[in-house]
């Protein structure tokens, strides 16, 4: 069963969209290093202007293994601190979903 993790953020007033995307690219490198398939989305309908950082895994066990590695990686913590300090976005929501085969 596949797993997807999504982090939705809203740009803060006055934030540079290019800087937001660059920060997401840095995060994507870390997630990919630990096995995630990363994509980045701009919301066009509904919560227009928000961004979605999405990470897919082939299975729940692959997701769990990646999370263990991410939490132990100093690069993850450094990137999180950099992201918070930059103040470019505000967290909207996070989701972790498992695929239902139909």
Which ranges hold each PLM region?
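Short S/T/G/P-rich N-terminal loop/turn motif that feeds into the first structured element of a domain
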Residues: 1-78, 82-102
């Amino acid at each position: 069963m596949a797993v997807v993790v999504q982090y939705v953020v809203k740009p803060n007033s006055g934030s540079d969209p290019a800087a937001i995307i660059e920060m997401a690219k840095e995060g994507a490198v870390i997630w990919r290093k630990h096995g995630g398939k990363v994509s980045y989305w701009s919301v066009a309908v509904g919560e227009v202007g928000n961004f979605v950082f999405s990470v897919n895994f082939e299975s729940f066990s692959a997701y769990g293994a990646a999370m263990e590695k991410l939490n132990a990686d100093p690069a993850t913590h450094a990137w999180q601190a950099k992201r918070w300090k930059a103040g470019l976005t505000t967290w909207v929501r996070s989701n972790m979903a498992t695929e239902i085969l139909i």
